[in-house]
Amino acid sequence: MELEAMSRYTSPVNPAVFPHLTVVLLAIGMFFTAWFFVYEVTSTKYTRDVYKELLISLVASLFMGFGVLFLLLWVGIYV
């Protein structure tokens, strides 16, 4: 197969929206991270729920992870 016959790969996400995605995803991730820390500090060991802790931390880590991914793409580190 020749190089000219191949179609050029285009990203499913427009690079012009990388800054906006970065800010939004990191802001949402920081909100859930702050919620997790406030929940840990204000609850006693009797009122804590491990499933709620896991859910909040999972959502926070997903948003922060994708936010960091788009931050890397925004600054030109293509992973």
UniProtKB/Swiss-Prot annotation:
Membrane topology, as annotated: Multi-pass membrane protein
Protein name: Dolichyl-diphosphooligosaccharide--protein glycosyltransferase subunit TMEM258
Keyword Endoplasmic reticulum: yes
Keyword set, alphabetical order: Cytoplasm, Endoplasmic reticulum, Membrane, Transmembrane, Transmembrane helix
GO cellular component terms given for this protein: cytoplasm; endoplasmic reticulum membrane; membrane; oligosaccharyltransferase complex
TM helices/strands, residue ranges: 17-37, 55-75
Its biological purpose: Subunit of the oligosaccharyl transferase (OST) complex that catalyzes the initial transfer of a defined glycan (Glc(3)Man(9)GlcNAc(2) in eukaryotes) from the lipid carrier dolichol-pyrophosphate to an asparagine residue within an Asn-X-Ser/Thr consensus motif in nascent polypeptide chains, the first step in protein N-glycosylation. N-glycosylation occurs cotranslationally and the complex associates with the Sec61 complex at the channel-forming translocon complex that mediates protein translocation across the endoplasmic reticulum (ER). All subunits are required for a maximal enzyme activity.
Pathway the protein contributes to: Protein modification; protein glycosylation
Any Gene Ontology biological process: response to endoplasmic reticulum stress
Molecular-function GO term, any one: oligosaccharyltransferase complex binding
Self-association and partners: Component of the oligosaccharyltransferase (OST) complex.
Location in or out of the cell: Membrane; Endoplasmic reticulum; Cytoplasm
Major site of localization recorded for this protein: membrane
Source species, domain of life: Eukaryota
InterPro entries linked to this entry: TMEM258/Ost5
Family to which this protein belongs: Belongs to the OST5 family.
